[in-house]
Swiss-Prot record:
GO biological process: adenine catabolic process
Cofactor(s) annotated in UniProt: Mn(2+)
Miscellaneous information on this protein: Ade is a cryptic gene in wild-type strains. The physiological conditions that lead to its activation are unknown.
PANTHER family: ADENINE DEAMINASE (PTHR11113:SF2), N-ACETYLGLUCOSAMINE-6-PHOSPHATE DEACETYLASE (PTHR11113)
Temperature dependence: Optimum temperature is 60 degrees Celsius.
Single GO MF descriptor: ferrous iron binding
EC number(s) from the headed UniProt entry: 3.5.4.2
pH-dependence of activity, as noted: Optimum pH is 6.5-7.0.
Protein name: Adenine deaminase
Keywords: Hydrolase, Manganese
Length: 588
């Protein structure tokens, strides 16, 4: 928990204080009073009866003593339960394929009033210009959009080609920005553990803020060393005992449930009354189809309550107050005097049925957000421009030669997990000794003209066709999976022609494609339109075989070297346990 930065975020003038105090004392008129409401008590459990009094962007009072207080406007909550606005503790908005403006439109009416965002996806493509755009969006947003300064661009030095650097000097230029809460996930945990000075310099520079971690499966002395360096949290835990050990050693645990990485079922049993202040909820990567059909943080709260029997006040605590405290945002996370009036009114607290949302003391209207979206996006000056510096490819670019009797490494996918297994398969004149092997390739897209890095993929479920994308963490080169070189080339050429995007090919034809004109990562379409296009993509992909629930998000992580066990970058096959490149053919 970091309390040293509270002064940065609780901006209130002396005049505002005097007005707020006057309303609290009952000597002045409130802007809004919410009547006929019960407030969920996140500290003691149970509920508090009585109105919520709002002056400006803050809560001036709570409780029955304000029943007859005067207000410019009264809101009848019709018996609703009031809870603090939801907070996502760690996400990459780019992974939703929505701009920050569109993301706000899609999620704020669902009660997501605050996000802690690491924009390292766009920073990997276009460097500081990408971070600057996110900062502009955050400055104008109604949603509280806070930024962690991206720490590992690229994710692992020397392992991949990305589009830009983000130097310590550039990082420091953003450290004191009012929307910055700390240093984003330190993915090079072997470098931190070994004491690499360049990484320790970054940690030292941001030590007075919050230092995000990233250490899937780490334990023993290595985990102790990583925490000793100052890392405060981790969102990559996927096993119960792993999460328990991190909590025991003083880490805060972010329980992640995204579109590909689904760790809530494994980790939710850890949450209890004692450790809930150290537990938070995050999505990391969640696409607009799931947001539209299932929800965002609201969906995670619902599952904690319905599937894991987490008490109401604890479920809502880990979705708000715990995260606010961890990031030093002490003006958020509680419905109490002096706190920012980020309020979610629920007609059913167990089902997380959102009736109305207020943020910074003002009611949110979904239709108004939608109507203003285009103008607000233009005002943010998005960094348009083609970032795909790659010529069209041919089938011969994906030709691999295999020798009968030889054994070859296979990246084995685990559906709905980011980790993979490293297995092998023997080749014969009839093919491989398992029938689920596809081809995978990663093509550098930043003008270095490297030959495609090629490998083998098992367990993905692709029986025919090809899938290609320019969303491939974290360097966002072109990744393609296919059963034939010809269809792989067709899919790659479509995303090149689109200036970035996603594509499904089957029967020698493009079945569906989605252009992503901002950095090859984001669309400028509305959330509804984007969800419909993703629905069409998923339907086309399902025709290719029994793929993961979110095939494109799962595919995007097959090139991320900082998550074990075997990955493919633009430089070749990478062993994520030894942190070293390896060969396609097994020779030892």
């Amino acid at each position: 928990m970091n309390n040293s930065i509270n002064h940065k975020f609780h901006h209130i003038s002396r005049a505002e204080y005097q007005e707020l105090l006057a309303v609290s004392r009952g000597d002045a008129v409130a802007d809004y009073i919410i009547d006929n409401v019960s407030i969920l008590d996140l500290i003691n459990g149970g509920e508090i009866s009585g109105p919520i009094v709002i002056k400006g962007r803050y809560i001036a009072g709570v409780g029955a003593e304000y029943t007859d207080a005067p207000a410019l406007q009264r809101i009848d909550a019709r018996g609703a339960t009031a809870v603090p606005g939801f907070i996502d503790a760690h996400l990459h908005i780019e992974s939703s394929m929505m701009t920050p403006v569109t993301f706000e439109t899609a999620t704020l009416p669902r009660g997501l009033t605050t996000v802690i965002c690491d924009p390292h996806e766009i920073v990997n493509v276009m460097g500081e210009a990408g971070f600057a755009w996110f900062a502009r969006c955050a400055e104008q947003a109604r949603q509280n959009q806070y930024l962690q300064v991206s720490s590992c661009v690229p994710a692992l030095e020397g392992c991949d080609v990305n589009g830009a650097s983000f130097t310590l000097e550039q990082m420091l230029a953003w450290r004191d920005h009012p929307q910055v809460t700390g240093l984003a996930e330190m993915m090079d945990y072997p470098g931190v553990i070994s004491g690499q000075n360049a990484l320790l310099d970054k940690l030292d520079a941001f030590r007075h803020l919050t230092l995000d971690g990233h250490c899937p499966g780490l334990g023993g002395k290595e985990l102790n060393a990583y925490i000793t360096a100052g890392i405060e949290n981790c969102h990559e835990s996927y096993q119960l005992e792993e999460g328990r050990r991190k909590l025991q050693l003083g880490m805060s645990l972010m329980i992640r449930e995204g579109s590909a990485a689904r760790n809530l079922n494994a980790l939710a049993p850890l949450i209890n009354e004692f450790n809930s202040p150290q537990c938070m909820l995050c999505t990391d990567d969640r696409n607009p189809w799931e947001i539209a059909h299932e929800g965002h943080i609201d969906a995670l709260i619902r599952r904690l309550i319905e599937q894991h029997n987490v008490p109401l006040h604890v479920a809502y605590r880990v979705a708000s107050w715990s995260t606010a405290r961890h990031f030093g945002l002490n003006h958020l996370g509680l419905l109490a005097p002096g706190k920012q009036a980020d309020i979610v009114l629920l007609s059913d607290a167990r089902k997380v049925t959102v009736q109305q949302v207020l943020v910074k003391g003002e009611p949110i209207d979904a239709q108004t957000l939608q109507a203003e979206e285009s103008a607000r996006l233009a005002q943010s000056a998005p960094p348009y421009g083609n970032t795909i510096a790659r010529q069209p490819v041919s089938a011969s670019d994906f030709a691999l030669q295999f020798t009968p009797g030889k054994r070859y490494r296979v990246i084995d996918v685990i559906h709905n997990e980011l980790i993979t297994h490293s297995h092998s398969s023997v080749y014969s004149e009839n093919g491989f000794d398992r029938d689920d092997v596809s081809f995978i390739a990663v093509l550098e897209r930043y003008g270095q003209r490297l030959a495609p890095a090629c490998g083998l993929l098992g367990g993905f479920g692709l029986n025919e066709g090809a899938l290609a994308a320019t969303v491939s963490h974290d360097s966002h080169n072109i990744v393609v999976i296919g059963r034939s070189a010809e269809e792989m080339a067709l899919a790659v050429n479509q995303v090149i022609q689109d200036g970035g995007g996603l594509c499904v090919v089957r029967n020698g034809q493009v079945q569906s494609h989605l252009p992503l004109p901002i950095a090859g990562l984001m669309s400028t379409d509305t959330a509804q339109s984007l969800a419909e296009q993703i629905d069409a993509l998923k339907a086309a992909a399902r025709e290719c075989g029994p793929l993961p629930d979110e095939p494109f998000i799962q595919m995007a992580f097959l090139s991320l070297p900082v998550i074990p066990a075997l990955k493919l970058t633009s430089q070749g096959l990478f062993d994520g346990e030894k942190f070293a490149f390896t060969t396609l053919e097994v020779t030892e």
